[in-house]
From Swiss-Prot:
SMART domains: ARM (SM00185). GO terms for biological process: autophagosome assembly; establishment of organelle localization; nucleus-vacuole junction assembly; pexophagy; piecemeal microautophagy of the nucleus; protein localization to membrane raft; protein localization to phagophore assembly site; protein-containing complex localization. It comes from Aspergillus fumigatus (strain ATCC MYA-4609 / CBS 101355 / FGSC A1100 / Af293). It is found in: Vacuole membrane. This is Vacuolar protein 8. Functions in both vacuole inheritance and protein targeting from the cytoplasm to vacuole.
Amino acid sequence: MTAIANACLSCLSAVDRWCHITACLGPIGGRSRDGIYETTLADNEREAVSDLLGYLENRAETDFFSGEPLRALSTLVYSDNVDLQRSASLTFAEITERDVREVDRDTLEPILFLLQSSDIEVQRAASAALGNLAVNAENKVLIVALGGLTPLIRQMMSPNVEVQCNAVGCITNLATHEDNKAKIARSGALGPLIRLAKSKDMRVQRNATGALLNMTHSDDNRQQLVNAGAIPVLVQLLSSPDVDVQYYCTTALSNIAVDASNRKRLAQTESRLVQSLVHLMDSSTPKVQCQAALALRNLASDEKYQLEIVRAKGLPPLLRLLQSSYLPLILSAVACIRNISIHPLNESPIIDAGFLKPLVDLLGSTDNEEIQCHAISTLRNLAASSDRNKELVLQAGAVQKCKDLVLRVPLSVQSEMTAAIAVLALSDELKPHLLNLGVFDVLIPLTNSESIEVQGNSAAALGNLSSKVGDYSIFVRDWADPNGGIHGYLKRFLASGDPTFQHIAIWTLLQLLESEDKRLIGYISKSDDIVQMVKTISDKNIESDEEDGEDGEAEVIALARRCLGLLGNGPKQTLVEG
């Protein structure tokens, strides 16, 4: 997340604050009638005050982070006079608000010293200055290396809200750097941050929840945060009226839900979580809607949550997000529905809720690879368990859309699309429809894809379509074309040496030989290359030491022998039934 740079310093304008600084320094640097300042200030302090007043007069041209201006400020910092320390801390706060850059320890050490003051005004301004400097990446690391966490943690426990706000804001900025996150988690800061997340002051609450979010980006830090008791607070704050707090808490919980152990804990202790997240999907703020859907997506990695989200009426808001024109909302919604669709009991509710057409439309309405993958994967899941749902997916135009797009989408999308066609091709009733749609025009070329997954899925789809289809005229037509046709695909897979590919090819070949289509069987019989490779496989002796491998190879050999038997070239011994 972005750093929080607006420190809770004062409601005065910048000009007013500069005037305030010079007004405070003026009487200190001058000689009063009763001589109090003259006697209480050391010579070097009086000189530093005088110099600083001059630098402030020309502040636009002055570099306060080095040389004499920094020495003058440092003299005030290490003074025993609290008024001088106040002026120094306020000056640091002002110059860092307008000039944030990488600084060295000579600048940071005086500010860290001021943090240890018992004076509230000094604490407040010093932590504001440190928070401003902590926007710079190099400064973040150096502040922690110089021991800045300890005084900041102490200030988080201050009774003063302004001090709390600045200290938490500074830690929020420090926690955006990867090098600091584990150190912050081990520093004792998590407990105070969690307590301040419940602050009645919205600025403190906002900074604290932002800091907690920054601590959720690694496994170890997430676990420490969970162990420190952050989950109930984050869940409670989902109902905050503040949009930023909602966003920070939703995103933090989304990150926490990445871990299976945390999802289990959430399921055991946070019964209102899903309902709260479903409600936030109807937020008027897109970033909150997006993170709510992503949090539900991560929760839906578990079966329990897949069902609970549907029961909590999560489908209607997800459908609205899916049909949004804002890409991040579409992506978060389609990723969520993809996980929800994994559960067989959710297939029909999702279809009945009206998701099919929007999911099909997403395939062609965006070039976003991730959205396309999630959309077609969801359609495949929805078709997995029943022929009714397979038919509805087909009627929604999924196969036609895949056929139109599959040869020009990225490999990852091709893999998902061919897998979806393979699932739909399991339905005997749909096979003629799929063939009439011309899926061979894309499946056959894709068996020669550069992607092993695309090759395998395409061949599996061809295999499923070859079984009990009734009319094999399309197989006859496409025996040699396109791209080598069915013959070329079988030849490549049989010659591949890959047991899985050989299994698919021989099983497909067996279906074609059992088709009773004389022309098709004639083509196969005349394909000496295919027949010879099947013979070679059938003559193999199993020598695998692994039982699974032995069973798989035995099945391939058995299928090869059955093919040869149907071709009239089988061995004399009894054929093994596969």
